Structure formats: C-alpha cells, structure tokens
C-alpha cells in the first residue's frame, strides 16, 4: 500500500467523515485516522445517536403511560422492554456506521486504525 496521502483526517466523527468524503470526491487521496473499530466517532457510536434513540423510546413509553388514556387509548398493561430498546438502539447505530463504511469504500478512503 502506498502511504502517501493528499489529506489525512483525524477522527471520523460528524466533521471528520464529511471532510474525508468531500476530499475524496474532489480527487484527493484521502485517509481517515480513527482509533475505534467503527466509523462515526463518539457521537454515532456512544454519544448523541445512541442516547437519542433511547430517549425517543423512553418518551414514547411515557406518552403511552400518561397521555394516551386522555385520547381514549387504553394502555393498562403497557410495559417497558429494555433489551428490545437496546437492540433497537444497536440496530440504529449499526445502520449508520455501515452507511459511513459504504461511503468510505465508494470514495476509496483508507481507514487507518
């Protein structure tokens, strides 16, 4: 592998992966340094996206418990299933990280770990 690059981006978070993709689209030989196995940085892997997914599920559960009855929707036996919530969160993260991986491959960006 030729280790000469026009652009080396440090980090594959929201700014990093966009920078790497755009650089490659402009014809620059691009690499992205990311210490994690998966692309997307903190936001996608353990920060913003996972927490928003769990928060959304929790808010829907709360509305179902507290507000649906006011609308004539009975939810007497509603219960929270944390393993399913976590699975949904993990699927969301996986889908998005795979999307970034696809864009890196499509644009011939080298992922340096």
Protein language model regions, located:
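Hydrophobic alpha-helical segments that mediate membrane insertion or helix-helix packing
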Residues: 9, 20-23
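Glycine-rich flavin
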Residues: 2-4, 22, 26-28, 34-113
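N-terminal Rossmann-fold NAD(P) dinucleotide-binding loop
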Residues: 16-17
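Beta1/beta-strand and adjacent pyrophosphate-binding region of the FAD-binding site
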Residues: 1-13
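The conserved SAM/SAH-binding core of class I Rossmann-like methyltransferase domains
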Residues: 10, 33-34
